[in-house]
Design a protein with these regions (language model features):
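Bacterial N-terminal signal peptides that target proteins for export
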Residues: 5-27
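N-terminal signal peptide c-region/cleavage motif recognized by signal peptidases
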Residues: 35-36
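Transmembrane beta-barrel domains of Gram-negative outer membranes and organellar outer membranes
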Residues: 40-267
Length: 267
């Protein structure tokens, strides 16, 4: 979700660095990395967008995210995200998280989490009458130790479609897709999200999102939530991203509190 500068110009277009979506439905069962944001998804939000990094440009994020449930806290401290414009309309993506899991009744664990790999492709440009459209398939590897709550325990695949439209100082993006997850007790599920943001000044953009997951862990049920946040452009290369929110349904089991803060370098 998140701040995204796909060129060396100040961030104005979207509020999402990239993808880190940690969905902690049961800390004792697993910490699920989704796009995203919590979010391994579109920093600083769970919802992502179709806009790739410009050709031969780079984005590097150093970020941390947290999710709190009735079972404890989990997240990243930090995670590194890198995006590269490998071709016109095509972006390569990787996230390497240092994850932590701190259950209410149990030992705090930390270590390598599930590495995320992805390719974003924009196949429709935005015009006055139509939105930008793209796809951003992701693979969540199972590099994290699931027995310690640092990973999912099996590879996940996410197949989303994203749309984006801008009107002056306002911009909105959203969409969703299907998660394929073969981990024990996990269910394949859908994620949908929509975001709206406004350029408050040359340096500051603020926005919010709503999102919904269908059931991810057997017997847990689906969940909905929201985040409020934004990004601040210090200059054309250096950016601060931030968000916080909570669940609206199934709150205690899935999201009593979530937060994201990150530094983004673009060149």
């Amino acid at each position: 979700m998140g701040a995204r500068s796909h060129s060396t110009e100040p961030l104005r277009a979207s509020m999402k660095p990239c993808n880190v979506k940690y969905v902690a439905g049961s800390l004792l069962a697993c910490t699920m990395l989704m796009a995203p944001r919590l979010a391994l998804a579109g920093p600083p939000f769970m919802t992502d967008d179709p806009e790739p990094v410009e050709y031969r440009h780079h984005e590097l994020y150093i970020s941390s995210q947290l999710v709190k449930t009735q079972d404890g806290r989990s997240g990243t401290l930090p995670h590194l995200e890198y995006n590269y414009g490998a071709a016109p309309d095509l972006q390569l993506h990787i996230i390497v998280p240092y994850a932590f899991n701190s259950p209410v009744h149990g030992q705090r664990e930390s270590g390598l989490g599930d590495v995320e790999l992805g390719i974003k492709y924009r196949f429709m440009q935005e015009t006055d009458s139509r939105p930008m459209v793209g796809i951003f398939p992701l693979v969540e590897t199972h590099t994290g130790d699931a027995s310690k709550g640092l990973g999912n325990g099996a590879t996940q695949v996410y197949l989303p479609v994203w749309l984006q439209k801008r009107w002056g100082k306002w911009q909105s993006y959203g969409g969703g897709g299907y998660w394929i997850n073969n981990a024990a007790n996990a269910r394949n599920h859908w994620f949908f999200g929509w975001q709206l943001q406004k350029d408050v000044s040359e340096h500051l953009t603020l926005g919010g999102e709503i999102f919904h997951n269908t059931e991810q862990i057997s017997g847990q049920g689906g969940n909905s939530g929201f985040n409020l946040g934004g990004f601040y452009n210090f200059d054309k290369h250096n950016h601060l991203l931030f968000s916080a929110g909570r669940g609206l349904t199934n709150v205690n089991m899935t999201n009593q509190l979530s937060s994201y803060v990150g530094y983004q370098l673009t060149w």
